Amino acid sequence: MVGEVRIDHTDEDVANAIKGFLADENPVDAIFATTNLLTICGLKYINSLGLKIPDQLAVVGFDETDAFDLFYAPVTYVKQPMAELGLKSVRILLDAIEKKGSSIESAIFETELVVRKSSVVTL
């Protein structure tokens, strides 16, 4: 399932998306948020429901933030190679400036899943 969240209504849209995921005939058992803001909004809403992470709902975020360490179940996240992303972006920008034009370029970077308590159910 995919939920749409508008940046100007983040808390409300995240809450509505999670409500829908949980009310579905086949409710989700995990949520993957694509930004730190969405992850944090999701954690706030899940807490307001009294759900226990990860026992009742697992949470995975995208990208690292110290805020994930403050939660009672530190958040699992996808770690991006930020230094490599920055260097590649600068190279593309400098090439565009030197060549007085722009081109579309794609790049693939290795990521790492950092597994923490928010996605690991202990028996």
Name every feature range the model reports, one short phrase each.
Residues 1-123:
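Bacterial carbohydrate/catabolite-sensing allosteric modules
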